[in-house]
UniProtKB/Swiss-Prot annotation:
GO biological process: heart development; negative regulation of transcription by RNA polymerase II; neural crest cell development; transcription elongation by RNA polymerase II
Alphabetized InterPro entries for the sequence: RNA_pol_II-assoc_Paf1 (IPR007133)
Subunit structure: Component of the PAF1 complex, which at least consists of cdc73, paf1, leo1, ctr9 and rtf1. The PAF1 complex interacts with PHF5A. Interacts with ctr9.
Protein name as catalogued: RNA polymerase II-associated factor 1 homolog
Lineage: superkingdom: Eukaryota
The keyword Cell membrane is assigned to this record: no
GO function term, MF aspect, one: RNA polymerase II complex binding
Any coiled-coil regions, as ranges: 352-381
Keywords in alphabetical order: Coiled coil, Nucleus, Transcription, Transcription regulation
Biased composition (Basic and acidic residues): 360-374, 386-402
Bias-annotated ranges (Acidic residues): 375-385, 404-430, 453-473
């Protein structure tokens, strides 16, 4: 075929058309290709056919030491595909007000069970082994019977059967039997873990209530940061924190806050001397503490909403493990210093130790009685007292009708009896009143408990007034006791004179 010859106009037209192209075509050949003859497509799909001959029959390739020692470069990104912004922490913070995609909301939906009260659902819940489960039945069966195939149901079958077979805590006898069974189970030796057979105990210690320290109410104080002083070494800081005190205070604006006091050097020496001499404190000794931090406080006790019981354990050498109750939880957060407000960094707390007063001893006895649970119910005691008084009055009524010849003696007894009855009634009323006070102290209201917690944790400023009142009450009580003793002595003298007259 004869070659074609392009004119100058055709070349210019070709250049104009190629100028409008965005991506120019590149060819591996330097000269212009006049003819293109591309290979046709393969008429059939590729197939994998096993090669029947040995691959190493012509040549056996063996890598040289140069290839083995060559270290190939790992062309990977420096962050390995995990982009983490270490400068701005807000990069990965999730906005709680963001709207979820409707497709993702299904992941947060709870599994809603189909209503099982209908007759149709009850029929589909039945498993019929001899019936062939076709496809249109299986979908319907899975819809109604999915609750029977859950793992939770399979695991809880044995527990459910155990509770249905044994009716525990049904009546008083079963409760007593269950309580006695706990004591029997406690006597059994522990050989292995209840759920991990391969775990064996290293040491077994008995656990008891802490009868020694239960009379003192304990509180858990949680700091938002370490309150240790920064300018003191770690061992010395621990010693200072072991002697630290917290106290409620009020600023000039009337805002309450908690002050954290640390002992000064003189107080540390005094406390160290007390420990060496095995003394709780030295009488008439003054201990000074300097304020270290100021906190805002939040208190939760048994009367607070959402309160959770909290206990702690005490390990005593060769004596066992004892647990005690943390009935108050105090959270302390740092208090921001206000601009222009007078700082209280120079505040000093001066402490003197004293013996417990009668009110504090009664509170300790109430806590001890609450632990021992030896207080009988007040209603039963009142009923018993009423029965005893009725029986005594019935016997007194029957005595005059026994004999008519002893009229003078019965008259004398009736004259003597009202005084004794009055004394017995007064004693009974005092005992009932004392029990009611004990019960009221045991079941105090939320406000009283909160006030008591604040007084126990942060102290009271009315100690001196209470001591003066107690001294006055003690003197009055001693005077009343002496007068009652004289009155009883005079009564005994009158009784002896009456007896001699009757003889």
């Amino acid at each position: 075929m004869a070659p074609t010859i392009q004119t100058q106009a055709q070349r210019e037209d070709g250049h104009r058309s190629s100028a409008h192209r965005t991506v120019p075509e590149r060819s591996g050949v330097v000269c212009r290709v006049k003819y293109g003859n591309s290979l046709p497509d393969i008429p059939f799909d590729p197939k994998f056919i096993t090669y029947p001959f040995d691959q190493h029959r012509f040549v056996q390739y063996k890598a040289t030491s140069l290839e083995k020692q060559h270290k190939h470069e790992l062309l990977t990104e420096p962050d390995l595909g995990v982009t983490i912004d270490l400068i701005n922490p807000d990069t990965y913070r999730i906005d709680p007000n963001i709207l979820l995609d409707p497709a993702d909301e299904k992941l947060l939906e709870e599994e809603i069970q189909a209503p099982s009260s209908s007759k149709r659902s009850q029929q589909h819940a039945k498993v019929v082994p001899w019936m062939r489960k076709t496809e249109y039945i299986s979908t319907e069966f899975n819809r109604y019977g999915v609750s029977n195939e859950k793992v939770e149901v399979k695991i809880g079958v044995s527990v459910k059967q155990q509770f249905t077979e044994e009716e525990i805590y049904k009546d008083r006898d079963s409760q007593i039997a269950a309580i006695e069974k706990t004591f029997e189970d406690a006597q059994k030796s522990i050989s292995q873990h209840y759920s991990k057979p391969r775990v064996t105990p290293v040491e077994v210690l008995p656990v008891f209530p802490d009868f020694k320290m239960w009379i003192n109410p304990c509180a858990q104080v949680i700091f938002d940061s370490d309150p240790a002083p920064k300018d003191v070494s770690a061992p010395a800081g621990v010693d200072m924190m072991s002697q630290a005190m917290i106290r409620g205070m009020m600023d000039e604006e009337g805002n309450q806050f908690v002050a954290y006091f640390l002992p000064n050097e003189d107080t540390m020496r005094k406390r160290k001397r007390d420990v060496e001499e095995e003394l709780d404190y030295m009488p008439e000794e003054v201990y000074e503490y300097k304020i270290a931090r100021e906190y805002n406080w939040n208190v939760k006790n048994k009367a607070s909403k959402g309160y959770e019981e909290n206990y702690f354990f005490i390990f005593r050498d060769a004596d066992g493990v004892y647990y005690n109750e943390l009935e108050t939880r105090v959270r302390l957060s740092k208090r921001r210093a206000k601009v222009g407000a007078q700082s209280s960094t120079n505040a000093v707390l001066v402490c003197k130790h004293r013996d417990m007063n009668e009110k504090e001893l009664e509170a300790q006895e109430a806590r001890k009685a609450q632990l021992e649970n030896h207080e009988p119910e007040d209603e039963e005691e009142e009923l018993d007292l009423e029965k005893d008084m009725q029986e005594d009055s019935g016997e007194e009524r029957e005595k005059p009708s026994d004999s008519e010849n002893s009229e003078s003696e019965s008259e004398r007894e009736e004259e003597e009896r009202p005084a004794d009855e009055d004394e017995e009634e007064e004693e009974d009323e005092e005992s009932v009143k004392r029990r009611r006070e004990r019960k009221s102290s045991g079941s105090e209201s939320g406000d009283d408990r909160q006030a008591r917690d604040e007084e126990e944790i942060f102290g009271s400023d009315d100690d001196s007034e209470e001591e003066e009142e107690e001294e006055e009450e003690g003197g009055a009580r001693r005077r009343s006791n002496s007068s009652s003793v004289q009155h009883s002595a005079s009564e005994r003298a009158s009784d002896s004179s009456d007896a001699s007259d009757s003889d």
